[in-house]
Amino acid sequence: IHGLAEGDRIFVEHYVGCMHCEWCRAGEYRHCELTDWRTNPDGRRYGYTSSDNPGRLWGGFSQYMYLPWNAVTHKVPDGVTAELAGLVTPLSNGIEWALNAGRVGYAKTVLIQGPGQQGLSQVVASKQAGASLIVVTGTTRDASRLQLASDLGADAVVDVLEEDALARVLELTGGKGVDVVLDCTSGAGTAPVLLGIDALKRREGVMVTQGEEAAFPDFPLKKMTEKCITLASARGHSYRSVELALEQLASHRFPLERLATHSFGLEDVDHAIRALAGETGEDALHISLKPWGDR
């Protein structure tokens, strides 16, 4: 691959673009038809492509990976450990969703729903962008993650099972509501979206939401229209966001190493997956899989 040499430490994006369409030329490989497995049954993407396909090694659960000529790679800066480099995907998503999709910037007020990898990454992105107020919501079982959100720069955290989240947001904003809502809840149903719509300012608020498998009957379009809310979707990241994530990790400005809560060897990959899925009671926030052990 052009620009790489043996011994380079690299981060490989999961997109495998064609490199000549309008999206690839703009560094938006996520939108390339060649790598979109949803619409292209022959699409290639690391972590999604079966080992039955040519190249075989299309994932990270191995000691080697197959890199075709069109693999999208980034050099990892010196001083960024393998565990930190493993945070590039959630952090680049956080940068993409908060700054580009959500338009978070100087003096903006932000509500982030869900203190997982993506939510905490958006705390960092919003803080770095100059947001004047960052509120993070979660549940009682998220107590340690809400504390981490505070340590990363959130101005207030709310346990939605113990407090009236909307009332708290309005209290913190003098009754105005926030400029931006970033919904990072997964499998929480429609309640977070409804809360986000109510918590936004009356005019020109922005809500960024994810939920590829979610359905929303009776969506409150009338309320969105009345409040002039812009709804944006969260999906993946651009090349530029990955570069910014690597720069952020190299700066060591935030204690991002605290997101890398667990580490396992290749022989424990099944346990690692179950731990991340919440099946083992370990509260794994982000897991590092080390195919070569501690080498």
What are these regions (language model features)?
Residues 1-25, 29-30, 77-79:
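Glycine-rich beta-strand-centered segment in the early N-terminal region that forms part
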Residues 63, 71-72, 77-163:
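Mid-domain Rossmann-like dinucleotide-binding core that forms the NAD(H)/NADP(H) cofactor-binding site
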Residues 162-164, 171, 175-176, 191-198, ...:
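C-terminal hydrophobic helical "lid"/dimerization subdomain
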Residues 205-208, 219-259:
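Rossmann-fold dehydrogenase core element
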Residues 25-44:
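Iron-sulfur (Fe-S) cluster-binding segments and ferredoxin-like electron-carrier domains
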